[in-house]
């Protein structure tokens, strides 16, 4: 096997880290899809089974073609998983994350039956907002960019032309007055705060202006002026004040995607006034005087804010006026920031395409009520997500990625490439059908067998009630079990899955959450209760996806509890058997022995290994270190540095773990010295 290392391709700006060369069906899939893109095919499908390395195939395609790429996932959990993997494959390139930055979001709404107006209320995640700004910056600056995102990318953000027009380019030796720099920063939605220096803030001390770029995770810019000339530009650490790098030039990007040049705002104010006059005349003619008064009061306040500050609360509702679009035209989105030759990958496309189609309708019905009752101008209807046909019109060359492509992919794909054989030689799980009337007792026996072997089990039920009852039953019988349901938020869901992998518990019960993309190699058994109840949760596609969760384990097995075999079950079992036969044949032909997947449990967003526990850190110290005094001293210095780094980043739990390991090592050194 070739040693891990970086691979480069002609005319490609990407440096691909290959932990291993492509294997199984990967080389054929990479060649076929790359050739399809080069031949100008718009739509292709990668039909890749679970654990066949679809992400690795995508990374190889991106590196070979050398074009910027957008990878769409159906939810934040899978997007985080893809982002972490892409960062491992492209550590030297710009891998960015673009998902909704709301931790909590209550949209503006009106309930006519109760005359209740609900103000927009939201909580924005600062870290994700910084990552979104970093994503658009990378797209505008570099060709070696991979963006991993969700359906959030079809919602309006600022016009790329306006956003680009607002950047502030600073060069050493350029002439610019202090007053002009400050005015430009305010126009870019930076705020002055000389006390609390955080992202999107600038501070001024005499001739020195410190700017904390909105898209920067940790470094700020120090601009030193000599009269009206830029004397120096330095990147520094805002915490310690230490200068990291001197720069000849620096580009400051706007503090928000919704920044707009002053002349555009003034032009928009006039068109908003014109629309307001027309709408008021219409409401008064219809005898809707309360609505007319309400609309005039709200809109005039917004106009005053726009006139004075250049932005207002809810500015996105005026996006049509600000972008100069015609009525009915959609707002600019992340897709508009992509170069014309960019690549698109839609992961788990059978789910994601459905989401892309459904976003527009729900948004429309809520806004129509707001317009009807005078809370918003009719142009607010054009601040909306893209319709599916509008998304299609903006699509770049695209690869649909799924183990179970739906009708849409089958109709649109010009080329279907199968990736059924896994690089590890693992084959699809054996599928068994057992009677449903004894399912719970039978399952309990199977769980005890797996738990004894340190393996994990996923159980999927049809209803919440059944999932709760089953969890209680298993818990009473001494099984370490957790229940995953829709009320659990994204972060907690990721933690539960991580705990399952770490062996904190052995069995995870769920309904519809144990499907697409869940990467849990430790799971050796998937049990599907009431598999013969035909419907969405037991359709052919759902069954294949759920069975696939056991495909990453050497002893993978799926048990379908059913009293009869439905058409969906038959098709799912036949497809699994077809794939299994092909995989076994490939292993036999090439003399491959299947090996299990060993994958580090990492924090998804930061892409780092999960923080070790107190004992784990100490036990992770190599045995030879404990017997060599010099090596032990080096290890103590390393742990001290690690502890300080964690403390500086406010990661106090990890800092405490490093401190405990440090104390344990020092005690060991002391005891050995005494002995």
From Swiss-Prot:
Q: Quick check: keyword Iron in the entry?
A: no
Q: Which residues form the Helicase C-terminal domain?
A: 439-605
UniProt function note:
The UvrABC repair system catalyzes the recognition and processing of DNA lesions. A damage recognition complex composed of 2 UvrA and 2 UvrB subunits scans DNA for abnormalities. Upon binding of the UvrA(2)B(2) complex to a putative damaged site, the DNA wraps around one UvrB monomer. DNA wrap is dependent on ATP binding by UvrB and probably causes local melting of the DNA helix, facilitating insertion of UvrB beta-hairpin between the DNA strands. Then UvrB probes one DNA strand for the presence of a lesion.
Ranges for domain Helicase ATP-binding: 35-422
| PANTHER family on file | UVRABC SYSTEM PROTEIN B
Keyword annotations: ATP-binding, Cytoplasm, DNA damage, DNA excision, DNA repair, Excision nuclease, Nucleotide-binding, SOS response
| GO cellular component term of the entry, any | excinuclease repair complex
Where found in the cell?
Answer: Cytoplasm
Q: Where is the signal peptide?
A: none
One GO term of the biological process aspect: nucleotide-excision repair
What residue intervals hold the motif Beta-hairpin?
101-124
The main location is cytoplasm
Recorded protein name is: UvrABC system protein B
Instruction: Provide the family line.
Output: Belongs to the UvrB family.
Q: What is known of its domains?
A: The beta-hairpin motif is involved in DNA binding.
Instruction: Write down the Pfam families for this protein, in alphabetical order.
Output: Helicase_C, ResIII, UVR, UvrB, UvrB_inter
């Amino acid at each position: 096997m070739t040693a891990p290392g970086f691979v480069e391709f002609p005319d490609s700006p990407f440096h691909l880290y290959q932990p291993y060369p492509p294997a199984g069906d990967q080389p054929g899939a990479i060649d076929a899809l790359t050739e399809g893109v080069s031949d100008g095919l718009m739509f292709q499908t990668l039909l890749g089974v679970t654990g066949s390395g679809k992400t690795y195939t995508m990374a190889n395609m991106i590196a070979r073609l050398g074009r910027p790429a957008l990878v769409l996932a159906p939810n934040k959990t899978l997007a985080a998983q893809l982002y972490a993997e892409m960062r491992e494959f492209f550590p030297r390139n710009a891998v960015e994350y673009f998902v909704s930055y709301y931790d909590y979001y209550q949209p503006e709404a009106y309930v006519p039956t109760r005359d209740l107006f609900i103000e927009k209320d939201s909580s924005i995640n600062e870290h994700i907002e910084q990552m979104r700004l970093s994503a658009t910056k990378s797209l505008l600056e570099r060709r070696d960019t991979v963006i991993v995102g969700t359906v959030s990318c079809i919602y309006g953000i600022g016009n790329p032309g306006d956003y680009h027009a607002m950047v502030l380019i600073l060069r050493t030796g350029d002439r610019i007055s202090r007053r002009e720099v400050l005015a430009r920063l305010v126009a870019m939605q930076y705020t002055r705060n000389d006390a609390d220096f955080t992202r999107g803030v600038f501070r001024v001390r005499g001739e020195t202006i410190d700017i904390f770029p909105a898209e920067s995770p940790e470094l700020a810019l120090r601009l030193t002026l000599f009269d009206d000339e830029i004397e120096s530009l330095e990147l520094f650490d805002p915490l310690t004040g230490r200068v990291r790098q001197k720069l000849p030039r620096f580009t400051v990007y706007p503090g928000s995607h919704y920044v707009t040049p002053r002349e555009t705002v003034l032009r928009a104010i006039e068109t908003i006034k014109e629309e307001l006059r027309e709408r008021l005349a219409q409401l008064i003619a219809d005898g809707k005087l309360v609505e007319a008064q309400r609309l005039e009061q709200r809109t005039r306040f917004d106009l005053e804010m726009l006139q004075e500050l250049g932005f207002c609360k809810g500015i996105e509702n005026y996006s049509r006026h600000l972008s100069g679009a015609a009525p009915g035209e959609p707002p600019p989105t992340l897709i508009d920031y992509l170069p014309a030759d960019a690549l698109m990958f839609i992961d788990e496309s059978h789910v994601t395409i459905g989401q892309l189609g459904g976003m527009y309708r729900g948004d429309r019905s809520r806004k129509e009520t707001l317009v009807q009752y005078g809370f918003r101008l009719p142009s607010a209807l054009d601040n909306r997500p893209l319709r599916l046909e509008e998304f299609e019109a903006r699509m770049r060359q695209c690869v649909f990625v799924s183990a179970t492509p739906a009708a849409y992919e089958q109709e649109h794909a010009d080329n279907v490439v199968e990736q059924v054989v896994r690089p590890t030689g693992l084959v699809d799980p054996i599928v068994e059908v057992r009677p449903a009337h004894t399912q719970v007792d039978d399952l309990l026996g199977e769980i005890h067998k797996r738990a004894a072997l340190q393996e994990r089990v996923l159980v999927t039920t049809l209803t919440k009630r059944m999932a709760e009852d089953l969890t209680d039953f298993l818990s009473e019988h001494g099984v370490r079990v957790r229940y995953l349901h829709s009320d659990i938020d994204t972060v907690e869901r990721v933690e539960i899955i991580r705990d399952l992998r770490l062996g904190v518990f052995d069995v995870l019960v769920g309904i519809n959450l144990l499907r697409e993309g869940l990467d849990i190699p430790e799971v050796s058994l998937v049990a599907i209760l009431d598999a013969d109840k035909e419907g969405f949760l037991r359709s052919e596609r759902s069954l294949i996806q759920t069975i696939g969760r056991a495909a990453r384990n050497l002893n993978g097995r799926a048990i379908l509890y059913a009293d009869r075999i439905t058409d969906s079950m038959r098709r799912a079992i036949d497809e699994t058997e077809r794939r299994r036969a092909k995989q076994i044949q490939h292993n036999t032909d090439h003399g491959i022995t299947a090996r299990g997947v060993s994958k580090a449990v990492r924090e998804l967003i930061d892409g780092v290994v999960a923080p070790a526990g107190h004992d784990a850190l100490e036990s992770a110290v190599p045995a030879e270190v404990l017997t060599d005094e010099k090596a032990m001293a080096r290890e103590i210095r390393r742990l001290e540095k690690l502890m300080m780094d964690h403390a500086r980043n406010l990661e106090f739990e990890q800092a405490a773990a490093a401190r405990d390991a440090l104390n344990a090592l020092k005690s060991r050194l002391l005891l050995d010295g005494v002995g």
